[in-house]
Amino acid sequence: MFAVVKASGFQRLVEVGSVISIDPTNVDSGGFVHLPVLLLVDGAEVVSDPDKLRLARVSAKFLRKLRGPKVRIHKFKNKTGYHKRQGHRQGVYVFSVTSIERGD
């Protein structure tokens, strides 16, 4: 069984045991988060009805906090000698999907 969930504005394809990284949310260390389900596939049966998906649940356990890849920003103006260099690393939370429930 696998599901498509909405996490941090993106759609992720997950199954039990998969590890996903999303933008920081309000969760304690070792805490759980429930992700909204957009599509559920159980063998040959596909569930896409919004009323049934409201009952479905994907639980994920918080593993660790990381920092994403470095993004370098460089501003430059021609003929003036102006340039500015800056970097940024976005915080990322890593979760492990522990269960997918249909909720019927």
UniProtKB/Swiss-Prot annotation:
GO terms for molecular function: rRNA binding; structural constituent of ribosome. It comes from the Bacteria. Keywords: Ribonucleoprotein, Ribosomal protein, RNA-binding, rRNA-binding. GO terms for cellular component: cytoplasm; ribonucleoprotein complex; ribosome. InterPro entries: bL21-like (IPR028909), bL21-like_sf (IPR036164), Ribosomal_bL21 (IPR001787). SUPFAM superfamilies: L21p-like (SSF141091). GO terms for biological process: translation. HAMAP family: Ribosomal_bL21 (MF_01363). NCBIfam families: L21. Belongs to the bacterial ribosomal protein bL21 family. Part of the 50S ribosomal subunit. Contacts protein L20. This protein binds to 23S rRNA in the presence of protein L20. This is Large ribosomal subunit protein bL21.
